[in-house]
Regions:
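A SAM-dependent methyltransferase catalytic signature shared across enzymes that methylate proteins
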Residues: 127, 168-182, 195-199
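Conserved beta-strand signature within the Rossmann-like core of class I S-adenosyl-L-methionine
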Residues: 150-157
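SAM/dcSAM-binding transferase cores
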Residues: 1-7, 11-31, 38-42, 185-228
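The AdoMet/dcAdoMet-binding core of the Class I SAM-like
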Residues: 25-146, 150, 162-163, 169, ...
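Short, glycine/charged-rich beta-strand-loop motifs at protein surfaces that mediate ligand recognition
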Residues: 158-159, 180
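Short, histidine-centered active-site or binding-site loop motifs used for metal coordination
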Residues: 16-18, 121-125, 157
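A generic structural signal for alpha->beta connector loops
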Residues: 69-71, 93-95, 150, 176-178, ...
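Short Gly/Pro-enriched loop/turn and capping motifs at secondary-structure junctions
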Residues: 160-162, 198-199
Length: 228
């Protein structure tokens, strides 16, 4: 993992791919973390939130800027991101219950009480960064089974090494009975919001852009939503 200093904090990269923008003061990162934080504001999960893959806690600065005090349960096999977060953002540590563990093992041990589960895992491979294979097969049904009634899953997806992923995205959507997808002008990522209690795509898009404008994130005008 390569760590570089930025104007507002730190940047974590692997093979030249930015994994996380760790901002140390409340505000936008202008990255995928802004969308994930804005979704928490828009979806307003009333109870437990889980995050698979911590990546330095990049969501915390935009969450703070949006006035969200929600505590999250986070799990990751790599301790470096957590240690950087504790060192550079000590006042936000109380907002995160972090555990070093395999995501599947940890999730299997949890009760079905999550109102929101965010899958944000990544692995380096051949000079690039991809999603682990469990994102496409093991995790979707497991995440579905750990959601409370009306719970929602959010996947931060990347193209697989083969580059063909439409069928994989559609399969995840079917697992949850429906989904909305967010694509980006600036990133190859696709964020999938899956569940049975999601607003219609036009309504969700309007609310998400409003939250991003409030955050002053450049992503407010660079996202595109559709039904998956």
């Amino acid at each position: 993992m390569e760590i570089t200093q930025t104007e507002h904090g730190l940047r974590m990269s692997q093979h030249g791919v930015v994994i996380s923008e760790l901002r140390t003061t409340p505000g936008p990162t202008h990255s995928i973390a802004d969308i994930l934080a804005a979704l928490i504001r828009v979806l307003k999960p009333p109870g437990r939130i889980g995050v698979l893959g911590f990546a330095g806690g990049g969501m915390q600065a935009p969450l703070c800027a949006l006035g969200i005090e929600t505590r999250v349960d986070a799990v990751d096999l790599d301790r470096m991101g957590w240690d950087l977060f504790r060192w550079h953002c000590p006042e936000w540590v109380r907002r995160v219950r972090w555990k070093k563990a395999d995501a599947v093992t940890w999730l299997r041990a949890q009760p079905a009480d999550f109102d929101l589960l965010i899958e944000d895992l990544s692995v380096p491979d051949g000079g690039d960064v991809f999603k682990p294979s469990i994102t496409w097969d093991v995790l979707p049904p497991l995440i579905r089974d750990r959601l409370a009634p009306g719970g929602i899953a959010v996947f931060n997806l990347l193209p697989p090494p083969g580059g063909v992923w439409l069928r994989d995205v559609e399969r995840i959507a079917r697992t949850f009975g429906g989904a909305r997808s967010v694509s980006f002008d600036d990133f190859t990522n696709r964020v999938l919001i899956a569940g049975k209690s999601i607003p219609p795509v036009r309504e969700l898009g309007a609310m998400l852009r409003a939250a991003l404008r409030r955050l002053r994130s450049r992503q407010a005008g660079r996202i595109h939503l559709r039904t998956a």
